[in-house]
Amino acid sequence: MSRHGPQSATSAQALGAGSALVRPHEMVDEIGHAGSKSALARLNEAMAEIKALSMAPLLQRAIDAIRADDHKTATEWALKALEQDDQSGFAWYTLGIAREKAGDFASSISAYESALRLLPDHAEVANDLGRLAFRMGMLEQAEKLFLHFLARHPGHVEAVNNLTCAVRAQQRYDEAIEILRPVLLRQPDSAMLWNTMASIVAEQGDYATAKLFFQEAVQLDPGFFKARYNLGNCLLMLGETQAALDACDEALKGVRAEDERQMMHMARSTMLAGLGRLGEAWDEYECRLHPRFAEITYFVMKGPRWAPGMDVKGKTLMVIGEQGLGDEILFANPLGELIEDLGPDGRLVIAVEKRLVDLFQRGFPQATVCSHITGAIGVRPARTVPEEVDISDVDLWTPMASLLRAYRRSVEDFPANPTGVAADPARVEVWRQRLAALPGRKVGILWKSNITKDARHRYFAGFDAWAPVLSQPGVTFVNLQYGDCAEELARAKAQFGVDIWQPPGVDLKQDLDEVAALCCAVDLVVGFSNATFNIAASAGAPSWLITIPGSWPRLGLSDRYAWYPQVRVFGLDRFGDWGPVMGRVADAVGAFAAEVAAEA
């Protein structure tokens, strides 16, 4: 980009904002498109006002290029117009549309802001800027921009829908429903509004009702492919995995925007995994590396990237961890076999989050383990290794999850005794001695994720659902939950009469070596899949997993967990109905405690 508008607080924040609001299994919003027919029509009307200016033909060519989806050419003509008059709001607006459609959000948001400053009465600019802010996860700014547009266009259906999406994404569900309800009552034939209402209901965990609303949207508009995709995600959460995949495949037939297509490919990969079609799933999962995938992480590495089928014997191969802590541990499942394939003359270099380095080094002593670092390219995260790490002899490199394409193409490919991370034996013994002073079986528990910004809470039982588990006699419960859990610990004491033992002197989020040792020292770990659960299970601790329908890491299995063979699975029968499964967990914990009592 050769020109940039003045940077405001909004554009400055964009440079550090998350890329996208929507994740796989999350619902996608219909908030309209920059450069829509109505927006381009208004631009054409504006051309009449500036037709006497020399830039008019340049802008017309830019608009024609946008219509033809030629965003590069549109950008070039808009920049030529700005070279003649950099105070033309319409030229900045045209540039903003072109850059947004090209996926260059940082430049786009700057251009839109310049347009809004120069065209304060052209409310369509505020609407487009709001949509872009929404796509980048800048929800408060998006809400204000949609309100600005509605002040000029009260009752505008699309703008009301957009505002609802912004409010809902901030988890203000009741407020979102109240904004949307009167408009939906006036226009009950609007598929867009039914899709948004369904998304609100789904985020609150009522997938059965959401399914009906998404079906209504699809029935009203069979060509509304985003609603069809959302229906697929809803079906997945209800355990209807094949129907979910069918809906996703239908949606892909009609979606043109590349970022939306890649998002759907990501969801499709997890649906395939949930059906046990692992080879297809991992091949599809490569979409996470597509440049138009909204949550891409760039890997900044020199040399060729490894691909399935390459002969690695005698090579030096670098594997880079990706996504969250739990993912880095989960996706490490094939590393043991990779080391065998490299042979005695080969070398494996593993780059992981710095808190995991010692755990990986103990688990894979033949490898060289270092930390990775994450910066940014534009608004996208970029991962590499520190300069002090010598990788001059690396022959090949790969993101860690890509190894699944070669080593885990079926459930049968998962070994009975996989190599994983390893706790410090000396620290395990220290914790065992401390725990020996406590009565009964020692059961570590995990009940939530620390991530709340994307409504992930609905994947975890509320703390009250743990009451039957915590009431089991003959057990000392040990807190393994990282993050702020003081309220839950106090409630356990006040409401259930249970003192959950808090490990002294340990930061359960940062001191992962101690966490691993503690997990291996207790008799059992029980909880949901988060970073700590993956550490415990990978290190070989006896572990019980509570999981929801549609959870792709189950790989279509109901009675076992292929990643960690010792894990016992307790699956939800129906999304949101935590009572039965927590009852089964409680009975199992009681039986587990009774075994020791009987032996004594």
Task: Enumerate the language-model features and the residues they cover.
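Alpha-helical solenoid repeat scaffolds of the TPR/TPR-like class and their adjacent stem/linker regions
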Residues: 1-524, 532-533, 537-600
